[in-house]
Regions:
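N-terminal pre-triad scaffold of radical SAM enzymes
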Residues: 13-17
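Cofactor-cradling patches in redox/metallo enzymes
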Residues: 24-126, 133-134
């Protein structure tokens, strides 16, 4: 990141009824340690809540953390809610227990990348840095 760019703004969301958030909290800390501005939604977010938070926080990246197995039903609804908020330029990534057989289908929906358990945090940070939409720094 150069001095002419603002820090990357990331929203980490826990959609659906998934009540396990340790991995999401570890990721939030890693992204913050890497110099990113991170908003964590907390548990039990609806697709509309995720999209509204992404719009209100003016994020460049939305990370969806899911362990419940409901990714095939939740992800399309979240992507549609983001489109309704006119957030077509936001990078959407996902992580959690997404079976390898579902990864191609999830990416086909519009999820840019899927990070499964065991993915090194440095790899996630590097991916976000390389793919987040660039925004100019706010004038002083």
């Amino acid at each position: 990141m150069t001095s002419s760019a603002s820090p990357i703004r990331v929203l980490i969301a826990k959609p659906g009824l998934d009540g396990h958030d340790r991995g999401a909290k570890v990721l939030v800390r890693a992204l913050r340690d890497a110099g990113m501005e991170v908003v964590y939604t907390g548990l039990f977010q609806t697709p509309e809540m995720v999209a509204r938070a992404a719009m209100q926080e003016d994020v460049q990246v939305v990370g969806l953390s899911i362990l419940s197995g409901a990714h095939m039903s939740l992800f399309p609804r979240i992507l549609a809610a983001l489109q309704e908020e006119q957030l077509d330029d936001v990078l959407v990534v996902a992580g959690g227990t997404i079976p390898p057989a579902d990864v191609a289908r999830v990416k086909g929906m519009g999820i840019a990348e899927v990070f499964t358990p065991g993915t090194p945090l440095d790899d996630i940070v590097a991916y976000i840095r390389a793919h987040a939409p660039v925004r100019a720094a706010e004038p002083l």
